[in-house]
Design a protein with these regions (language model features):
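Hydrophobic alpha-helical transmembrane segments in integral membrane proteins
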Residues: 88-106
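Non-catalytic, solvent-exposed segments at the cell envelope interface
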Residues: 103-110, 118-120, 126, 131-481
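Internal/C-terminal transmembrane anchor helices
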Residues: 71-94
Length: 481
């Protein structure tokens, strides 16, 4: 074979390879651009348009270079680079979408369980040995009925339910020997534990039914303002678990005026509890035991606003977030030693790592104003986190932050909305002005609790003037004042 024939054959081979690479490049480009525009990525300073033009321009250039049969080596190099860049970008975008999807994955439901329990030393070890149970059918009728229906369907077992005023009262009756078996709703267990820290070792569960509660879809945002409910639950483990909410902060955001207002409603605020609370008055933290919807509706009713989205994190995720941000800096206006971790917090600017931050936001017994001071400390840490999250450096590391939190934070904010916020921040630059406020009231020990009717609990009776002031401040930010 002559040298010219070899060159001709090599040239044809290169052209075929180039056409193949161009097809792969085009396919990757179509998927990449589809995702970029579907999820509104890079939509600041026309960067998404610039990326599109560059991708299309390279495809057109390579097409004509292949047709011309010239500079074949250069064409191959350009196509290989293009395929590599598109493939890597598509993988990164896919990973990012996967991470954010997992943030939303459990946002439409919450998990809890209903059980039949007996004393740990009871000879009863199977549901077939039980004929009657005690439980609060007056306050948790629907969940108890679901358990009874499941027992009938799966075990062909019908039980007589003796009425108790609460799960705590049922547990006390079990300890006293007045009943042999009780019903337990997992979301009420930490209420029992607050009075009987060793209760878990005193009982054994002989039957459990896992249940799921559906959460409402997000409310549409109109204009530049919206509200986010930030809930901190008082448990470790899966974020989808139903639990009391010890942190209740409404973040009011106005993108036009670049203002953020953080409103803390103390956990002990005495308010009508929506949904499962039947609009009966109780401390706000107990709304969380009926699901995140109950907390949202309770606060919406209290302040007369819509909460468009929610972000729910447990103390496990709180630790992760602080670690991912490299700690936070806050000003501490009173020295104290935390009961939870024994750490000392001096007056002045302090840098908090994850464990120190957790102690800082959980402490209330060593603070002059108790739970209200704790709420203010929570606001300080939230502000510090927001300032870091809205910094350019944090936005560059957005994917790693989301990856680290994907299993410990729950939000119903769609990816498109998240990207709109990121794009708006990158487009306009600057920083948000963050202010905070907290609802005030008077502490009392004589107010009845719907969830714990036998207990004498600390409640905060809300000040009417403080409530009106808080409402006005939220509306001012919403209206751009």
């Amino acid at each position: 074979m002559s040298r010219s024939s070899k060159r001709a054959r090599q040239g044809k081979t290169k052209i075929l390879i180039s056409w193949g690479l161009l097809a792969i490049y085009a396919l990757l480009a179509v998927f990449l651009l589809f995702l970029i525009f579907k999820y509104n990525m890079l939509a600041f300073r026309y960067l998404n348009i610039v990326v599109t033009v560059l991708i299309v321009a390279l495809a057109i250039l390579c097409f004509f270079l292949i047709r011309s049969k010239k500079v074949q080596n250069l064409t191959l190099i350009l196509l290989l680079l293009g395929v590599l860049i598109n493939g890597t970008s598509l993988f990164a975008v896919g990973q990012f979408i996967g991470f954010t999807s997992r943030l939303n994955a459990t946002s439409n439901y919450s998990n809890y369980s209903m059980s039949v329990a007996v004393l740990a030393d009871s000879p009863i070890d199977n549901i077939s040995q039980v004929t009657s149970v005690m439980g609060p059918t007056g306050t948790d009728k629907d969940n108890i009925q679901q358990l009874m229906n499941d027992l009938k369907a799966s075990q062909n077992k019908e039980l007589t339910v003796e009425e108790s005023s609460s799960y705590l009262a049922a547990y006390k009756s079990l300890l006293a020997g007045d009943t042999k078996a009780i019903i337990l709703n997992s979301v009420f267990e930490n209420i029992i534990e607050s009075e009987y820290p060793d209760y878990a070792s005193k009982i054994k569960k002989i039957y459990t039914k896992e249940l799921t509660k559906t959460v409402e879809t997000p409310k549409d945002v109109k204009g530049d303002s919206f509200n986010v409910y930030i809930s901190g639950i008082d448990t470790y483990g899966p974020i989808s678990s139903v639990s009391r909410s010890d942190v209740n902060i409404i973040m009011t955001v106005n993108r036009e005026t670049k203002k953020i207002l953080l409103t803390t409603t103390p956990r002990d605020s005495y308010v009508p509890i929506a949904d499962g609370g039947n609009n009966q008055k109780d401390k706000l933290t107990h709304a969380g035991i009926y699901g995140v919807d109950a907390s949202i509706h309770t606060l919406e009713n209290l302040y007369g606003i819509d909460l468009n989205y929610y972000a729910r994190l447990n103390f496990t995720s709180f630790l992760k977030l602080i670690d991912l941000l490299g700690g936070v800096d806050v000003y501490n206006d009173q020295e104290f030693t935390a009961h939870t971790n024994g750490k000392f917090y001096p007056v002045g600017n302090v840098h908090l790592d994850s464990e120190q931050a957790l102690g800082f936001v959980r402490e209330r017994y060593s603070l002059a104003d108790g739970d209200r001071d704790r709420g203010r400390n929570q606001q300080k840490v939230i502000v510090a986190i927001l300032q870091k999250l809205t910094s350019t450096e944090a936005l560059k590391n957005y994917d790693s932050i989301i990856k680290g939190l994907q299993d410990s934070i729950q939000t119903n904010m769609p990816l498109e909305t998240m990207m709109n916020l990121v794009n708006a921040q990158l487009e306009s630059g600057g920083t948000y002005k963050i202010n905070s406020q907290d609802l005030k009231g008077t502490g009392r020990m004589d107010l009845p609790s719907y969830a714990m009717p036998e207990s004498s609990l600390y409640m905060m009776e809300i000040s009417d003037s403080s409530l009106e002031s808080v409402k006005a401040a939220i509306n001012d930010v919403m209206e751009g004042k």
